[in-house]
Structures are given as structure tokens and as C-alpha cells.
């Protein structure tokens, strides 16, 4: 069966699909689905969501509580297509343009008297992370799916602000090398102040993973220099290497119940899982498994996991219907799962993939860890508070593994090895990176990172 819902997008047909020939820039893939994930990171109220809106035309703030307080709370997401005009007389950066993901593949160039057609170069998915310090765990979950990051720094405040440094540390943990720095709100400051802050930014990024990142002055509200961001996304962010031939695996970062109250029984739809495919290709009709699935406690206190088995009945990338989905941008997977299991993000942190091909479910981990020297983003009187204390037995920490956040207890520590007993089981594998946070002044603070050496498998 082929997709036909949008006449101006290229048609996908599962029968003609050859996974060995797919690339992240295959035309009938990027016509409908984003294949590169870019995160927006930075301090609270520095304009992350506004930049995403300026590039993609999509407002990522979806919840009333987010509107009222003007902050992002859940992970926002939006897709955008990036085009370049095929007329050689069309000068850069104006020849680059971005549009919503359901825009046709070769629109007319909008510059007066140009007459060229736009060529689709990239289809990107923005993961809009919260900048608020209390929401650090949400930001780390988003970092798990990023290929690159836009670091926002507001031009009307000194640099660095607390969460700016905390987010830089987080992307160093995730080993995210492709970074573009945006000096936002440039319309609010005089030229001398902007130059002075440019110096502060250069000093701040020295010795960090963002050391050689380009710095672009922009105004997201006035849409000033947005075309330059598009050009830099195309030129500075390499196309990630993707694995299309392995068994599919996807991490879930959002999940929904799409039914309205009062629906008739025959109208009820199954739950929807949103996330990013790490490897392999998902197709409509595939039999899938979700792990760890439903977690329950027995009477004797033993934890039991029942993986969920179901079929894929629809695939979407924003408003675009898909017949198959590839690794990269965020997609929605419509399933036959009971909607109550998916509502209000209940499936977040689970792993979805081919039946019997997913990693083990662990209840305890042995990790090789590294601690930061001092706490980031904490304003303290002296040096005493901000130093990171060593891990000790019976410490309670929070671990982020992929898009899962769970509490854990330190059972044993020796040099840079620790054994962690998890509060809830996770589906993971050896070699996966994890982030560690500790509770400081009622908030979780990033204290270090580690790598899973081995795990204790859950026995049902």
C-alpha cells in the first residue's frame, strides 16, 4: 500500500522498499520524515522554543501550565524542512529557507524576481528541552536522541548562566560534538554590549566540547539571521551514520491516548508511542514488543515485568502519514496497545522493537563512573557546598539511561566502579552511557556519568 494523503509529497511504497539502498537523504524518506535530530539547549527563558518556532513554524509549547509560566516543561518537538534555491544568482544566506514538514518538496523561491525553485536538502527534527534547573532530568532524556545541538545564549544577560554550564556538561557526557551557538535577543542590546558578550562566550566555551562551535548573532522574535542558521545546519552538521538493516529499535520519549472522552466503543483507537528509532526500519503491520512493559509488584515484594506485544497500525511524522519509518526524527507509532497504558507519557523510557530481539531487562547495574569536580548551576556561598561529594554506600541517586529516569540505591563502591540497585527495571545493554544526579537542596543535580559494565537480569 502507498501513502497518498498529501499530493505534494513523494509517495512511499513498502513493496518497493529496499533497506540496503536507504540513506538519511533518500528523497522519498525526507519528503515525509525528518532524519536528523537537533536539540535546543541553554538557560531558562533564553529563547529555545522561540528559535524552534522561527525555523519550523511550530509552537512547541503545548500545555496550559507551560503557557502561563512561559517555560517549557515537557519535551517539545517540531519538524522543519530546509531548502536551498537552485538559482546560482540567488545569494547566500538568503537562498536558504526553512518551512513546516508538510510543505511540498520543490516550492517556488520567494525572493522577488528570482524565479528559481527550492531544493529540499535536509529534514530535521527539533527536540526542544526545558532550561529550568528543576527539569534537568527531562533535558537529559532529550539528549539521548540528539545528533546535534543549538546552544542558546541570551544577549541581554551575562554569560554563562547556571543552566548554560549544566547543559554543556550534559552534552559532553552524551559526546555530542556538533554544536552551533546562537547569541539570541541581539535586538535588545547595543553593538558594544553584544561584542563584549561575544568575548564572554568565547572565554566560556574554551576547553569545552563546544570550543570550535560557530557563534551566530540572531533575533528569534524578529526572525533575524534565521536563514544563516539554516545554512549552518546544512554545512556544519554532518549527516549521521544510520543503521537501516538491523532489527528495529526505538526509544519512547512521549506516549498518548488519542481518544476523546465519550467516544463510542467501535471508535476507540489504540495507544500512540512517540520517539526516535535508533536503528532498523519500522513498517506498518510489523509485530512489535515493548519492554519492560507493564511493571507490577508481587505480594512477596518481587518485581514482575510483562512485555507488551502488538502490531503497528499507523506511522506518522507530525501530519505526514508514513508507510515505513527510518532512524532519525521523531515519529508517532499507532498501535493496538490498550490506550490506558499509553496515556500521559506512561510508556516513556520503554524500548520498542522486533519481538524477541530487544535487550535484557536489568534490575541492578554495575557501572564505571566519573564524577564532576563541582556541582554546576548551583550558586553557593563558599566552595564547600559546590564540590561533588564522593559516592558512598546507601546513597540515593537518579540515573538517566536513554530516555528513562529512575531512582537507584548505591549498593557497593570501589574506586570508579559502583553497583546500583534500580527502583524500577530498565531495558538496556552493556556499554550504554548513563547520567547520574543527586538531590541537592530539594532538586536533582547532575553529578557525573558512567557506562554500564554489566547488569543483573530480571527473572520473572
From Swiss-Prot:
Subunit structure: Eukaryotic translation initiation factor 2 eIF2 is a heterotrimeric complex composed of an alpha, a beta and a gamma subunit. The factors eIF-1, eIF-2, eIF-3, TIF5/eIF-5 and methionyl-tRNAi form a multifactor complex (MFC) that may bind to the 40S ribosome.
Protein name as it appears in the record: Eukaryotic translation initiation factor 2 subunit 3
Known role: As a subunit of eukaryotic initiation factor 2 eIF2, involved in the early steps of protein synthesis. In the presence of GTP, eIF-2 forms a ternary complex with initiator tRNA Met-tRNAi and then recruits the 40S ribosomal complex and initiation factors eIF-1, eIF-1A and eIF-3 to form the 43S pre-initiation complex (43S PIC), a step that determines the rate of protein translation. The 43S PIC binds to mRNA and scans downstream to the initiation codon, where it forms a 48S initiation complex by codon-anticodon base pairing.
Region (G1): 42-49
Start and end residues of each stretch annotated as G4: 184-187
Keywords attached to this entry: Cytoplasm, GTP-binding, Hydrolase, Initiation factor, Nucleotide-binding, Protein biosynthesis
UniProt gene name: eif2s3
Gene Ontology cellular-component terms listed: cytosol; eukaryotic translation initiation factor 2 complex
Record's keyword annotation contains Protein biosynthesis: yes
Interacts with cdc123: annotated segments: 450-460
Source organism: Dictyostelium discoideum
Subcellular location per the Swiss-Prot or TrEMBL entry: Cytoplasm, Cytosol
Cross-referenced PROSITE patterns: G_TR_2
Region of interest called G3, as start-end residue ranges on this chain: 128-131
